[in-house]
Amino acid sequence: MNLWSKIHMKKNNLIFIGMPAVGKSTVGVVVAKRLGKNFIDTDLLIQEQEKKLLREIIAEVGEDGFLEIENQVNRDLETENAVISPGGSVVYCEEAMQHYKEIGTVVYLQASYQTIKRRIKSPKKRGVVLREGQTFQDLYNERVRLFERYADVTICEDGCQIEETIEKVLEEIEKMA
């Protein structure tokens, strides 16, 4: 196998990033099925490793402790031919994001603040951790810069139904093949 084939094979994963409620898991499952790839939700891997729900982990070790666990689980994930849906806060985990850039194509599912706010009635119930004095708008603005920094492909889903977003993703992936 030549070097190009090895590189191409290593980068055959798709990693979906974006705000909570943007549809990373929903879109990811369908895209994985259509492309014949495995689907991995890293929040479930974290819960499995820690034997606790995410909110219990955060309550126990705090936001920084959770980010350490999230970084470790995402950084250590070794897989091929998969669609990976990490939690929205993975963009704070530099080692994990560098790993994802090496093993796949990072797809940013982008939606406006208004769209996300409409989908998430209560950020706290959704498990979104806000720092003292931080608003959901602040969190959105902070993360958008990171999503844009790491994205190989950006899919704007404002005004789209889920099926339209899936089609946009598949079209972009086809262009890259």
Listing of model-derived features with the role each one plays in the protein:
Residues 87-90, 112-114, 160:
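Short glycine-rich anion-binding loops that position phosphate/pyrophosphate groups of nucleotides
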Residues 19:
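P-loop (Walker A) phosphate-binding loop of NTP-binding proteins
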Residues 102-145:
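A glycine- and Lys/Arg-enriched "phosphate-lid" helix/loop adjacent to the NTP-binding pocket
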Residues 16:
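Hydrophobic anchor at the beta1->P-loop junction of P-loop NTPases
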Residues 2-11, 30, 34, 144-177:
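NTP-dependent small-molecule kinase module
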Residues 22:
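ATP-binding Walker
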Residues 25:
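Walker A/P-loop
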Residues 42-90, 94-98, 137:
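ATP-dependent small-molecule kinase phosphotransfer cores
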